Amino acid sequence: MFTGIIEEIGTVKQIRQGTASAVLNIRAERVLEGTKVGDSIAVNGICLTVTSLFPDAFTADVMHETLNRAAMSGLACQKRVNLERAMQINGRFNGHMVAGHIDGTGKIIHIHRDDTAVWFTIQTKPEIMRYIVEKGSVAIDGISLTAVNI
């Protein structure tokens, strides 16, 4: 489980395509602290398992279906990604509970900035909208947001 509070913005160093999956190599610093092989890190909100660690990066396998269905379809080298380690039972809980399993994708169709906030209008399919409630939480690229107007 994750909280939707991004710890760090990492950078995709390499994507190696395999027959059934791809291996992502992601440059990071903060999320590597205390992380072990087998731990979970959310990459743009998608729960991935760390398969190897380096001083400045980690790798994770991603199934092709995940790459094609989720917001990772446009992933490329040098792209920046939101990173968050799995929440700890004894840690602070901000944001909301984020499983790291993607229900669907949407498209930002309008952005409005005012003195206190940035407002996004996001369009998605009706089968996704039925799960979104006014004043409820939603994770966009792993970021915990509140749905204001439906």
Regions found by a protein language model. Give the residues of each.
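Conserved loop->alpha-helix
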Residues: M1-I150
